[in-house]
Amino acid sequence: AVVHAETSTGVCNPVEKIGRLVKDNSALYLVDCVTSLGGMAVNMDDWQIDALYSGTQKCLSCPPGLAPVSFSDKAVEKLTNRKTKVPNWYLDLSMITQYWSGKARVYHHTAPINMLYGLYQACYNIFEEGLESVIERHLTLHQKLVNELNGIGLELFVEKNARLPMLNAVEIPEGANDGDVRSRLLNEFHIE
């Protein structure tokens, strides 16, 4: 398992390279795309990802509350051929796969319909702009911010080749109080 876009550090992990290492292994490759989905390229099939999950509250620009997931055929096969009972009924993904398979459905949970409408609209907005355009917008705005930060003497915490385009970790200069910096950003500029 690996986190694609690490929010605590601003690092983009090399998910594609890790996928090439894992592909000839019987292990399943799980990737957390909570921060990256909708903000940068995520190529599940090309990167050999078996299970991917995200959240709606980050780059999908949707209220929190849903966790979009996707599984490779290999992962679904593992789920359906499981020999041991899942100890928690609510977390039994084999029941959820029945929603996708066309088999007789087993009631598993009450879907949050209002959240699904919100996710539908968020995805519509992304596709209306174009996913490539959305990704390019994140890159363009990231570079503008980096240029301005560098122009006033600030540096980013992460090396250029491992930076996230949608989350910028900035080094606080020597002698500056990080609490004061964050308070001023929030109170004067509405930046968290």
Spans of features found by a protein language model:
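Fold-independent oxyanion-binding glycine-rich loops
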Residues: 2-6, 31-34, 40, 55-57, ...
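Conserved C-terminal alpha-helix-loop-beta "cap" of PLP-dependent enzymes
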Residues: 150, 154-192
